[in-house]
Amino acid sequence: SAASDVYKRQLHDCAKCLPADEKIARCKKHGLPISQVEFANPELLHAKLGAYYAREKYGVDDEDIRSAIEFHTTGRPAMSLLEKIVFVADYIEPNRKPLPEIDEIRNEAFSDIDASVAHILKNTLTYLDSGSCGDTDEMSVRTYKYYTSLNSED
């Protein structure tokens, strides 16, 4: 149903409001691996916890939906269309603070979603490399390389 689809789309941030120490504790409790970057930046764990809760608390059996939740902050190489849509939508949503090149990225999202993914990751990695927000997650780097290589083949 349409209501069910809206509900599932909102699950991507269901663990976002948990305090940092609680995110770490819950990941440990549920046997979810925590990388060094995630331990240093626990806000990243909301995606992993959200995917876990989608399955365990909310009964989401669809692997594509759970993967879209898990990778909506970092992306991953070779994402499905749903994963790309959730990744891009999370970045370009209207309530987000103004970001560099956001209008261009929003336009790309509707004409070339792979280019939009690469553009988002370029901006994210530039921001992280500036030292503004801690370490860079390796999955974001791998995803950026994957999507820039797709665009260079054109």
Residue ranges of predicted features:
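Short, small-residue-biased leader/transition segments that mark boundaries at the very start
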Residues: A2-Y7
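Histidine/acidic-rich helix-loop-helix segments that form or flank divalent-metal centers
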Residues: A51-L99, D103-A109
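Histidine-centered active-site/metal-ligand motif
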Residues: H12, H46, H72-T73
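Divalent-cation-assisted or electrostatically stabilized phosphate/pyrophosphate-binding catalytic cores
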Residues: C27-L45, S80, D103-S149
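Short alpha-helix carrying the canonical HExxH Zn2+-binding catalytic motif
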Residues: Q10-L11, A89
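Helix-adjacent hinge/juxtasegments
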Residues: A25-I69
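Conserved alpha-helical segments that form or flank metal/cofactor-binding pockets of metalloenzymes
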Residues: L11-L32
